[in-house]
A protein has these predicted regions:
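Short amphipathic alpha-helical coiled-coil/interface segments
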Residues: 1, 74, 103, 107, ...
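Aromatic-anchored glycine-rich loop motif in surface-exposed flexible loops
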Residues: 2-67, 78-98, 246-275, 284-315
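An aromatic- and glycine-enriched ligand-binding surface/loop that stacks and positions planar moieties
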Residues: 49-50, 64-69, 76-238
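Surface-exposed, extracytoplasmic segments of Gram-negative outer-membrane nutrient-acquisition systems
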Residues: 216, 220-265, 302
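Conserved, function-defining core regions and hallmark residues within catalytic/recognition domains
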Residues: 278
């Protein structure tokens, strides 16, 4: 289900094969139009439904997906499926209420409570190895180090995103537009229509605190380590600042962390969270808003729960 979901996000029309005993000669007969767009989403949902029906409410071994993880991914699938599209330009043709009701069903707080899920007290805790598999991590891809193998089951996927001075190769750089999008008014509300009129100024502009957990900014410690102050120079950023001087932060770790294997490329044992509890709250809120059946206040409450945690995330 996870693999098919990612493929569908990227390519829309995908090949779905459920026959694990298919003969190689039959591969050339496969088509990405065997099923309609809606049918493909339903096939993916069916996989997560099977997981939901068969997984335990709580896993004894840390990191394994429980029933709530399947429910969350099932809800996410139905949320994507609800927005019906047509044509090569992906024109929205309608929003399916039955799919939205499934989103509400599988984001039920009781399901999440049985799994012990909730928001972390600080947003940053989702991206620090010492808090892995915490309350907010509904499902994550697990990584490890020093597990008896040469390189461990490390996350090499982020090996090119560390700043130039700390390995290689300063890819996945945050844009100025992204930084500007974190600007807020004096009440902490987003500047939807004017955020990009002028570039963010740290000394004068109000900003969502999540910026400092997402983007490494010149003058600030890298991953909260004051031994590594980000500089606006070629040592930290590639191509002489052609792509700016912000650096990727969220998916990387403290350079002094024992979870890190250094070399030409750096890799760490930091898990990659696929679905957080905050995602579950916001998916439920979106479905309630689109259904417009008298529960808008409930949706606003869910959104404010996430926003309130963000406002206090100054760790």
């Amino acid at each position: 289900g996870h693999a098919h979901f990612m493929l569908k996000q990227l390519f829309k029309k995908i090949v779905i094969v459920n026959d694990e005993n298919m003969e190689p000669d039959a591969y050339n007969e496969l088509s990405n139009t065997t099923y309609t767009n809606d049918e493909q989403w339903q096939k993916i949902a069916d996989d997560f439904q099977f997981a939901y029906d068969n997984l335990p409410e709580v896993q004894i071994e840390k990191g394994r997906p429980a029933q709530a993880a399947a429910a969350a991914y099932l809800a996410k699938t139905y949320l994507y499926k609800a927005y019906r599209q047509d044509g090569a330009d992906n024109t929205l043709t309608g929003i399916n209420e039955e799919d939205l009701k499934q989103v509400v069903k599988y984001t039920d707080p009781l399901i999440m409570a049985k799994g012990g899920y909730g928001l972390e007290t600080d947003y940053s805790m989702n991206f620090l190895p010492q808090y892995e598999n915490g309350a907010e991590s509904v499902w994550a891809i697990q990584y490890s180090i020093n597990d008896g193998t040469y390189n461990g089951n490390l996350n090499w996927g982020m090996g090119l995103t560390t700043p130039q001075i700390l390995g290689c190769c300063d890819f996945h750089k945050p844009s100025q537009n992204l930084v500007n999008a974190f600007k807020t008014d004096s009440q902490g509300k987003p500047l939807f229509s004017t955020y990009d009129n002028e570039n963010y100024e740290v000394a004068t502009d109000n900003v969502d605190p999540r910026l400092f957990h997402t983007v490494g900014m010149p003058g600030f410690p890298y991953k909260y380590n004051e031994g590594y102050i980000i500089q606006k120079n070629d040592d930290w950023s590639r191509s002489k600042g052609l792509y700016g001087y912000y650096v990727s932060l969220k998916e990387n770790v403290d350079p002094d962390c024992d979870c890190l294997k250094k070399g030409s490329y750096w890799a760490s044992s930091l898990n990659h969270i696929v679905i957080r509890y905050a995602d579950v709250l916001l998916m439920r809120a979106e479905a309630l808003i689109q259904l417009n059946d008298g529960r808008i206040t409930d949706a606003i409450s869910l959104i404010n729960e996430v926003r309130s945690r963000a406002a206090g995330s100054t760790m």
